[in-house]
A protein has these predicted regions:
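Extreme N-terminal starter segment of soluble prokaryotic enzymes
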Residues: 1-5
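Compositionally biased, intrinsically disordered low-complexity regions enriched in proline and serine
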Residues: 6, 48, 86, 117, ...
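An amphipathic, aromatic/His-enriched active-site/gating alpha helix that lines ligand/cofactor pockets
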Residues: 17-42, 46, 55-94, 137-151, ...
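Short secondary-structure boundary/hinge segments and terminal tails
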Residues: 47-49, 160-161
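Surface-exposed interaction/gating patches
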Residues: 7-12, 98-177, 218-221, 229-245
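Charged, often glycine-rich, active-site loop that binds/positions anionic groups
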Residues: 51-55, 166
């Protein structure tokens, strides 16, 4: 499996309209051609920044999607339409850890959450696989005790992003009060204190951000949105800066 990580900056007042248009005009064509939406999120701290995370079977699928976007008239029309909504866009290709759940597994399990925790670790060159293995063996079971589930663990493919990027995404509760309790449990856990010391040898820097699952057609989303949901059911919430240290 491969994953496509699209960071999209949207005109703030048009964000919900963009979600609707993307769901009707872009998503069906992509999924028909093998690019499956795993999650569409609003990102804190910049609230008009969105993350679209896609799952693909292999590099051949990615090549086919690229050719489709370059040549297909419908995709050309979408690109012209998207200019009205998007002010910036960056993408990168991710490779999953062996234990990272696939979309099929996520759909079968209980991974819906209003809040997800996104961590971006800057790992020393050549240590990405070693760090991800430690996440799977040590941090994943630890976090589950606190009430978090791993949604994905990925490393960025060289040439598509800064070197040494490892991204983890976790469920983090349905209200901010639940996150506060999760964080409190982690800070009292001696195993987590040990992990932070140990993890420092792999990653000198890690950035934490909240993701908000507020898009009705996203497989990863708040359980308070039923499927299918009307566009007016999508609503923003107050979002503080994430802190976990």
């Amino acid at each position: 499996m491969l994953y496509l990580y699209d960071s999209i900056t949207i005109v703030s007042r048009l964000q919900e309209e963009f979600w609707k248009v993307m769901g009707s005009d872009y998503l069906p064509e992509m999924e028909q051609n093998g690019m499956r939406l795993l999650g569409m999120f609003m990102m804190g701290i910049h609230y008009n920044e969105n993350l679209a995370l896609w799952e693909l079977d292999d590099w051949a699928t990615l090549d086919r999607i690229q050719e489709l976007q370059d040549k297909h008239p419908l995709m050309k029309a979408w690109q012209r339409e998207a200019v009205d909504y998007i002010t910036d866009f960056t993408g990168k290709v991710l490779q999953p850890a062996p234990f990272s759940p696939t979309l099929a597994k996520l759909k079968k399990g209980d991974y819906k959450s209003t809040i997800y925790l996104h961590t971006l670790a800057k790992v020393h060159p050549g240590k990405e696989d070693e760090y991800m293995e430690a996440v799977g063996k040590e941090l994943k079971p630890m976090a589950r005790r606190w009430g978090m589930k791993l949604v994905g663990c990925y490393k960025a493919v060289a040439g598509t992003a800064s070197s040494g990027e490892v991204i983890n995404i976790w469920t983090a509760g349905n209200i901010h009060g639940e996150w506060v309790k999760i964080r409190a449990k982690s800070l009292k856990d001696p195993a987590y204190k040990k992990w932070e010391i140990e993890a420092g040898k792999w990653r000198p820097k890690v950035v934490y951000r909240f993701l908000y699952g507020l898009v009705p057609y996203s497989p990863l989303r708040t359980p308070f949105l039923q499927e299918p949901a009307a566009p007016e059911e999508v609503r923003t919430v107050a979002m503080p800066e994430v802190e976990w240290k």
